[in-house]
Amino acid sequence: ALLALGALGALGVAVAGQARGAGMGGMAGMPGMGGMAGMDMGQSQPTAAAPGVGVFSRALLIPPELHGQPRDGVLHYALRMAPGRSMLVDGLQTATWGYNGAVLGPTLRVPRGKAVQIDLNNALDQSTTLHWHGAHVPGEMDGGPQSLIAPGGQRRVHFTLQQPAGSLWYHPHPDTRTGPHVYAGLGGLFLVDDPADQHLGLPQQYGVDDIPL
C-alpha cells in the first residue's frame, strides 16, 4: 500500500499490508522564491537506497530519520524551514524549500506516550506554519493557519501522543498558501511508533524493507 502525500507528488512509506514527494517545474516565478542562489541547506542529507533492477537511472533517496534527544524526561526535536536548491533533474538546479535541508524534511519518529518538544525556526521570507497532519494534539499545538511563524520567527510546540502506530506527515498550513508552500518542498513523514506494534511481524528496517516513497 502507498500513502500518497502532496509534497512533490508523493511522499509515504510502503510496507507489507499497511501504509507507512516529484515534479517541481515552474517554480522560478513563485512569489517569495527569490534570493536563493548559493544557499546550502545540507544539514539533513538523504541517503540513497541500493538501486535494483529496473529502468530508473537515479537511486531512490531515503530521508534521514530524526529521533528526539532525551532530556529531563522529554524528547527534543528541532526543525528549520529554509530555502535551498535541489537537483531534481540531472544538470538542473531548482529553487526549493525544505526542513533541515534543501527540500522536504527528515522522517520524525515519535514514540506513543512520550512527551515531545519541537522547536521550529522559520528562515523563509514568508510567514508559514507547521501542521501535524493526523496527530491527536491540542488545538493550540496543531499548527493551523492561526499559528503563523513570521520570517525569522520561532515557535515551540509540545505534546504527548496517545494514539496507535501510524503513518502521518507534517506540512505548512498558512491560509491560502498551503499549496504553494508544499509544492516548494515543505513536507515530511511523521511516524508514530508503538511498542504494541512490534509483535505483528511487519517490516521494521527503515530504508531497507520499510521504504519511504
Explain the meaning of each model-derived region.
Residues 1-13:
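N-terminal export leaders
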Residues 6-9, 20-213:
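Histidine-centered copper-binding motifs that mark active-site loops
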